[in-house]
Regions:
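C-terminal secondary-structure termini that scaffold catalytic or DNA-interacting sites
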Residues: 1-17, 346-359
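Flexible interdomain linker/hinge and immediately adjacent N-terminus
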Residues: 9-13, 109-153, 210-213, 258-267
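N-terminal core-binding DNA-recognition domain of tyrosine recombinases/integrases
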Residues: 31-136, 156-161
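Basic, Lys/Arg- and aromatic-enriched nucleic-acid-binding interface segment
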Residues: 148-183, 249
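Short, basic (Lys/Arg/His-rich) helix/loop patches that form interaction surfaces
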Residues: 158-161, 275-318
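Conserved tyrosine-mediated DNA breakage-rejoining catalytic core shared by Y-recombinases
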Residues: 188-232, 240-241, 246
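Active-site/catalytic core of tyrosine-dependent DNA strand-transfer enzymes
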Residues: 225-289
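Catalytic-site neighborhood detector that most strongly recognizes the C-terminal catalytic loop/helix
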Residues: 320, 326-345
Length: 359
């Protein structure tokens, strides 16, 4: 009877890697993950959020993420994140699952050859965090409070040290409160995106609307209602030339930074350049909302005021650029009265029945 021969691996034996080599390889893998997500069309903010989740898990684990086991995930999600908000737990879990899917497709063989570890996702059907992402309930400031904010801010324009930058910040915040644009949509507006000839009041071409599920930016036309046309006319005619360079230049930004590009043209303002002045104005003129008033709160305020003024949900949905009407309903909850109306109608029906019994 033939005997079984000893099978020997003919591949070159891999020496144990130095810690520096493992660290460099981990950095390369992480950089490849970021590049792959960018290639998939995800926005920079989404990628930054995933990276933040992974970095926090890595800091807790204190070793490469591919060494994380289901037992480690049980400890992390069962103790460290036990009392964390549902959205935090779900986001961190999804980031880990996506990262390990990337490792499995691109680097599993290399990781095994280098470390002897077979990388597997530590999140399974047993320990996967349950729950559903729900938007936070936001109650925007009242119309009187927002009026007080912009009245005080406008008065400050007469005495401020730099008129043009403050007027730019004022006009951008005012526009967000009037037609509900997102801060990233506002910063990407060009001067040529204002179409005065369209519609009754003019329209603005939003080219960088928020996308979803890798759709990329969603464009839309927003009518300059609710006084937005007056805000933009004042800014373009009286302020823009103090910050911008050539109004006929293709791609000239609507809201310019004080800095310039390498070629001498006006640079585009960043999102933080719009957020910080709004926070400062709220602290000065609306202290009840200090550290709470953001561009997104102004967006909720706009939706609530449009609904309160009689605008239907479909029109508000188109103005805000929502893909689903259910999202818009979360924005106008403050002024919706269907519960109160149902209660009043029920009381009236009960009163009518009692009248019939007493007659």
């Amino acid at each position: 009877m033939a005997k079984l021969a000893v099978v020997r691996d003919l591949r070159d034996a891999q020496p144990e890697p130095a810690p520096e080599e493992v660290a460099d390889f981990e950095t390369d893998v992480f950089a490849g993950f970021v590049l792959a997500r960018s290639a998939a069309g995800l926005s920079d903010s989404t990628i930054r959020c995933d990276v933040s989740h992974l970095e926090q898990v890595r800091a807790w684990l204190d070793r490469p993420l591919w060494e994380m086991t289901p037992a480690d995930a049980d400890t992390y999600f069962g103790t460290v994140l036990r009392t964390a908000p549902v959205n935090t737990r779900l986001g961190r879990s999804q980031a880990l699952r996506t990262y390990f899917e990337f490792i499995g497709l691109r680097h599993r063989v290399q990781i095994h050859a280098m470390t002897g570890i077979v990388a597997q996702c530590p999140i399974d059907e047993i320990n996967r965090p349950r729950g559903q992402r729900r938007p936070a309930l936001r109650i925007p400031p009242t119309a009187e409070q927002v009026r007080c904010l912009f009245t005080g801010w406008r008065a400050e324009l007469a005495t401020c040290r730099k008129f043009a930058p403050m007027a730019r910040n004022f006009a951008a915040a005012k526009l967000m409160s009037q037609v509900g644009l997102r801060v990233n949509e506002v910063r990407h507006l060009d001067l040529a995106d204002i179409k005065w000839e369209l519609g009754r009041f003019g329209k603005i071409h939003v080219r960088h609307g928020k996308g979803a599920r890798g759709s990329g930016p969603r464009e839309r036309m927003v009518p300059l209602i609710n006084g937005a046309d007056r805000t933009l006319r004042w800014f373009v005619q009286d302020v823009w030339s103090q910050l911008g360079d050539d109004p006929d230049r293709p791609g000239a930004p609507l809201y310019c930074s004080e800095r310039h590009n390498a070629d001498g043209t006006s640079a585009r303002i960043g999102t933080e350049g719009l957020r910080a002045p709004l926070a400062d104005a709220a602290a000065a003129h609306l202290p009840d909302w200090s550290a709470r008033l953001t561009p997104h709160v102004l967006r909720h305020f706009c939706a609530s005021q449009l609904y309160f003024g009689g605008m239907d949900l479909i029109a508000i949905q188109e103005t805000l650029g929502h893909a689903w009407i259910a999202t818009t309903m979360n924005y106008v909850h403050v002024h919706r009265t269907h519960v109160e109306d149902a209660w009043v109608a029920g009381q009236q029906r009960a009163a009518d029945r009692l009248k019939g019994l007493s007659s």
